A protein has these predicted regions:
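Phosphate/nucleotide-binding beta-alpha loop and adjacent structural elements of enzyme active sites
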Residues: 1-232
Length: 232
């Protein structure tokens, strides 16, 4: 019997909340995490790959961080790009922390002013990199995604352009977990207006939405029993 371990932020961890609320018995699913950092530390999706047999697609823009992601998640599809509303290149601001050095996951194409001021107050410095940008439909095609159970979007203030690109016509996830910390719950709901997502809940700095056209399957009694027997 494998002992479950969660990797996400906060208490309860984000991945535990996702697992217990939306995917308590699903095995062999597909996850997409944008802003995946090194693929393990504070990851909302690694649990599903490690313990539930999912395939993970990870997107990370930071040049210093992406090689760590490749080493940590060799079984995943790892994409070195920044999700946005246009394809091409853009300036990515990588953050260097006085405590953690370059291993810090607050980089962004567009920090919100309050977040940027907070990072400066903490003594952080910044290095600009020219990085590849990719739209949501291009990402789905490039990663070969034909099924998507979970999309976790946490790109430090650049969520609005990424959500805009989700309107361009591509496969949408059954469950969307998006960081609302820089905007608030209600503003995030406005950003997602017109897309087929129903607000489900909010926890810590994340909002959770269910795709009304393709919701996650509700596990039956037999599936729940089998999952308890397996114990992993």
């Amino acid at each position: 019997m494998n002992q479950r371990r969660y990797y996400g932020q906060f208490d309860p961890p984000v991945d535990q909340y996702l697992f217990e609320r939306f995917f308590p018995t699903l095995r062999g699913g597909v996850s997409l995490e944008c802003g995946s950092y090194d693929g393990i530390a504070e990851s909302s999706c690694y649990f599903f790959e490690k313990h539930r047999g999912w395939h993970g697609v990870n997107v990370e823009a930071s040049p210093p961080i992406f090689p760590q992601l490749q080493r940590n998640r060799p079984r995943s599809t790892n994409v070195h790009a920044a999700l946005s509303n246009h394809s091409g290149t853009a300036r990515f601001k990588h953050v260097i922390s006085p405590q953690h050095g370059e291993n810090f996951g607050n980089g962004s194409l567009a920090h919100q002013p309050a977040h940027h001021a907070e990072l400066i107050k903490e003594g952080c410095s910044f290095v600009d990199y020219e990085v590849r940008t990719i739209t949501y439909p291009e990402l789905i095609a490039e990663a070969g995604i034909v099924r998507l159970d979970l999309f976790v979007l946490d790109i430090e203030g650049h969520e609005a352009p990424a959500i805009e690109s989700m309107r361009q016509g591509a496969l949408l996830p059954s469950v969307l977990c998006v960081e609302h910390g820089h905007f608030g719950v209600e503003k995030m709901r406005e950003m997602l207006g017109g897309l087929p997502f129903r607000f489900d809940s909010a926890l810590h700095v994340n909002s959770f939405y269910v795709n009304e056209l393709n919701p996650p399957a509700r596990p039956g009694a037999l599936a729940k029993l089998w999952d308890r027997v397996r114990g992993d």
